[in-house]
Amino acid sequence: MTYASKYKKLTPIDHVLLRPEMYVGSIETQPTPMYIFDPEKGRMVWETMRVNQGLLKIVDEILLNAADNINNSKGSVRQTYISIHISDTGEITVENDGAGLPIVRSREHKMYIPEMVFGHLLTSSNYNNDSTSTTAGRHGYGAKLTNILSTKFSVVCRTDGRESHMSWTDHMRMATAPRVNRVDPKEKSVTRVKFMPDYAHFGFPNASISLDMKRVLHKRIMDLAAMFSKIEVRLNNVPFGFRTFTDYARLYSLPGLDGSMPPEPFVYTSPNGSVAYVPQLTQSPKRIVGVVNGVVTYNGGTHCNAAMDILDSCLDSLSKNFKKNGKVVDTNRVQRHFTVLVFLIQTQPKFDSQSKARLVSTVTMPRMPKNTLEKYLERMPFLEAHVNSMDDQLANELNKEIGAGRRLSSKTLISAITKLVDATSSQPDGRNIRTLIITEGDSAKALALNSLSSEQKKYCGVFPLRGKLLNVRNKNLKRLKTCKGLQDLFLSLGLELGKEYRSPAELRYQRLLVMTDQDADGSHIKGLVINAFESLWPKLLQNNPGYISLFSTPIVKIKVSGKSKEVIAFHSFRDFHRWQRAHPSARYTAKYYKGLGTSTTAEGKEYFADMEKNIMQLTVDARDHQLLDSVFDAAEVEWRKEWMTKANAFQGEVDIDRSKKTLTIPEFVHKEMVHFALVGNARAIPHCVDGLKPSQRKILWAMLRRHNSEASKVAQLSGYISEASAFHHGEASLQETIVKMAQNFTGGNNINLLVPEGQFGSRQQLGNDHAAPRYIFTKLSRFGRLLFPEEDDPLLDYMDEEGTFVEPHHYVPILPMLLCNGAVGIGFGFATTIPSFHPLDVSAAVRAMINGESAKQVVRNLVPWAVGFQGTVRRGPDNEFIAVGKYTAHPNGRFHISEIPWMTSIEAFRLHISSLASADVVQRIADYSGANHIDIDLIVRDGSLTTWAECETDLALAQRIYINGTVFSPTGTLSPIDSDLSPVLQWHYDRRLDLYKRRRTRKIGLMKMDLARLQSTRKFVEHFRQGQIDFLNATDDTLHKTCVKLGLVRVDESFDYILKKPITFFTRTSTEKLQADIAKTQAQIEELKRTTPVKMWLTELDKFDKTFQEYERVLINSIQKEQRSSSITGGVELPALRQPLLMLGASAKGATAYRVHACQYEKPPPSKRRPGESVGGARPSDSAARTVGKRLVGSRSEFKNKKPMSRKNNVKVSLSTRVAQXPGAQLGRLLPHVLM
């Protein structure tokens, strides 16, 4: 490809189709928390919907056209209705009466006005900048975007006795000629737009609208009806009929936990709009619904801020009144009791983009009497719960403890705070600001001290922050008592808790300079410092811009090759990447500064030589309190989820403009703090396709790359992985991750990707009892290349870390590893808990999808499981599961426990049993448990544990399994999936199948290249053997020309693969072998062409299944060998077997697999009894052999009468089932019938 061919010029239509996000927002369906109308409850509910913003926007454009017509319909022609119809196929029709478009030809453009307005970009009637205009349209895109992003689009316009018809197809490229007819002038003017969105382009699998999007559009149309309540708005012929805005606001009222309803909403309506404050009896994250001229601003804007300012102002006034009486109102928590609705009519509104998600222009709010809202707030029933006594006493106690408020001498201060290096001058000299530099740890402190000049040390002190800073939002002084770092910082500055500061003049230092690493953790420390000061002393920051300042150091330095040897420092990756684009052919070496410890003392002196040049001043205003509250307040989880959902998960750079000398709180939060949040989530939340977190992926990549069969010490291996994969965090955390990836005890990994050689932990402490990394060894397990085939490697998308390609963004294993091993992680605003499932069950699920079953069908039948577990997992309520251990009840209160839920450690279980002994429930304990098996005999007090339910509960033998998933989607965005794991299966299935297609294509291409090389070699050899090439007398140039003349292929732009062969290569034997290689390669190509991607997948699944079955057999045998050969005999065992593996698909040989936990009985069952029927009085034999995880395979005909997809056909031991299900069944009554 030439450089010129890379550059293209697109038509406007093609540009919209290729880059729709620039015009209508993202066309990727994303989980979005929002208000939605619940028809069963008859009110709004807050739910997470799967929303396609692009699709929503193109529908919105047509709705807004109909709404804009209300303002155009004045005088005698009034608009009376807007009618919307959404068909089952997804075709949408919007019709309205009113003024309508004139059906005349434009003299300038030679076409009818409807054709211009709906079929040509950049046409509009809103270009006159009318200062009184209240329409939503501004840019001339609107309905044309809907036309372009639809498969068909038609318009009917009737005005002044004329009616026009026109339609478009092929994304507005093809248009029918306008058809204009005469009609009765008395007929009402009508505009009817009908269109079919291109659902495939928006990523909808069935090319039709989803149920979630129907509900979202229903809510959107309700908002329109509330905005324009004077006209009738109907959906599918059903009018909404809001008589007043108060009717609409009442839909947001949420009943309390006891069913009581909150007070009526506070609603104020004026000619330019309505504002409603809807009280709720329980707290929730701050929620605002904003609409401007009919446009729903999903990201808020100036009108939403103004409405919150009104509420803040009233609450502040209320708080002052309470303060006079020695009380304080927690205004932040009171705010969380309100949902705010802002519906405004504004002249010439301006939005942040064509998608109009945020209003940016100045707004005029309805003028409401301030004291009216204050009186309303005073009557709120929840207000008293947030009126507390002043924290003065606690603040005074803490001030005494830390010595705050006292003027301490430098000597006394240093003895109190040993880490503080105080400025040598006690007073500022008028020219220099007395500054306290706080650093991230001692190494950064050393850099600062070594770099400051003697003159600078007169007015600059240095204090290192050690340990984790706490979040002290909402003046949490009790929590502050536990944070020594912040206490010492406040003492160093001379700050007193509970005191209001308006100037830093009375403090020991007049500026706080934060000097941290330029990575995500450094951003977090900056955020916590800013949060603490804004929470405790907001006026100090608001009245003194730059009191908190940030010190910026380079994150990348490059040394340009050449005579100049120029060194260029970059303070952001954005500037570095911009330089790279501007100098594509430049040669340079780069040094990355992820921590301050990377800088030399000489470099540090450069930073401080022009100290003010590297400082950014933080500016804070009163409105920033709400934003910081959203980021740091524990109650604002939903806000943080929305914040993270909208952010790009793989944003690798801090996007702050370092050339500016000031930084606002919104800039810091949305451009730097978000970086920490994204990185924190990336570390904690797994990827949906490979189930790995970044550190796990780095380890796996390094181990796959190593190709070694010998085990290495974990401590040494971590060093290799850290260097090879550019891991920038402590090796201790990497070693811990390596250990966890190798653990294979029951409840650890179902598939351990690394081999544990040594003590890697056990069920005793769920792996926490592993030996030190310097004593244990590991290597890649046999599953490594089975799950991550080497043929995949060239097709993966690799990360660029410090100019070097390292691990891929994500792997695409043959199985969804997230389901095989599960995942637990807590990120920023998000957490994930996904249990593990049996790998062979997951393999069967993938086979079922290959056979045509949907992900939702398949996932419905998966049950959490840990390999080696000998108990039972049963379904509970609300998508929960319950893992139950295995135990046997004997006469005289004796119990034998042989299994516990795999999430519980043996030590924790032993501690629980000991507590029962202390309570005199358990009278005797005999513990024979090993590292990985449970074997405990108990004798309980007579009368205790009389029912099966009590046994499970009191002995902690049952544990709930919750599924609450959040994962990174294939595109790298955070996707909450809750308890529905079907997206994980579907995402993995789509990616893996696509990879097989690409792998097959690549392999065929490589084999064809090999074939061409072999054929060229044969052609040259034949000419040589026939004497047509005089090899001995030929020059290199002559041989090269001969190869060109013969039409031989080049390899790496040369013919060396032929010309540098040894002379023995031209013998008859070699020639015959060459011919055989050609025939073999041709046969392989033909065989590969006949092999489908699905067949390739099934072949690799068969290899994995066979290997894992052998691995599981060995593992279970090892567990059973550790168990006692005999224990207390006789008794009733519950449960005796696991629910069967539900039929999920056929294997390659047409057989269907089931997993059954078998149980044998001392008395032979009746000859006519079928498996699973009642057993009468037979009792299980403790000495009888039990097979755990046995795989029974039979032909499909053998199981044709079974319906394993149905939960009703699960195999159970009827005796245990009957005893467990007998209402109030007591062991005292039941045991005589079943025990001898």
UniProtKB/Swiss-Prot annotation:
Signal peptide: none annotated. Homodimer. The gene is TOP2. Its cofactor is Mg(2+); Mn(2+); Ca(2+). Control of topological states of DNA by transient breakage and subsequent rejoining of DNA strands. Topoisomerase II makes double-strand breaks. Mg(2+) 1 binds at E440, D517. Residues 434-548 form the Toprim domain. Residues 1161-1211 are annotated as: Disordered. It is found in: Nucleus. It is an enzyme of class 5 (isomerase). The record marks I826 as: Important for DNA bending. Its EC number is 5.6.2.2. GO terms for biological process: DNA topological change; resolution of meiotic recombination intermediates; sister chromatid segregation. One of its GO terms (cellular component) is nucleus. Eukaryotic topoisomerase I and II can relax both negative and positive supercoils, whereas prokaryotic enzymes relax only negative supercoils. Disulfide bonds: none annotated. It holds the Pfam family Toprim. Binds two Mg(2+) per subunit. The magnesium ions form salt bridges with both the protein and the DNA. Can also accept other divalent metal cations, such as Mn(2+) or Ca(2+). Keywords: ATP-binding, DNA-binding, Isomerase, Magnesium, Metal-binding, Nucleotide-binding, Nucleus, Topoisomerase. CDD domains: TOP4c. Residues 685-1101 form the Topo IIA-type catalytic domain. The active site is at Y775. InterPro entries: DNA_Topoisomerase_II (IPR050634), HATPase_C_sf (IPR036890), Ribosomal_Su5_D2-typ_SF (IPR020568), Ribsml_uS5_D2-typ_fold_subgr (IPR014721), Topo_IIA (IPR001241), Topo_IIA-like_dom_sf (IPR013760), Topo_IIA_A/C_ab (IPR013758), Topo_IIA_A_a_sf (IPR013757). Belongs to the type II topoisomerase family. Residues 956-965 are annotated as: Interaction with DNA. This is DNA topoisomerase 2.
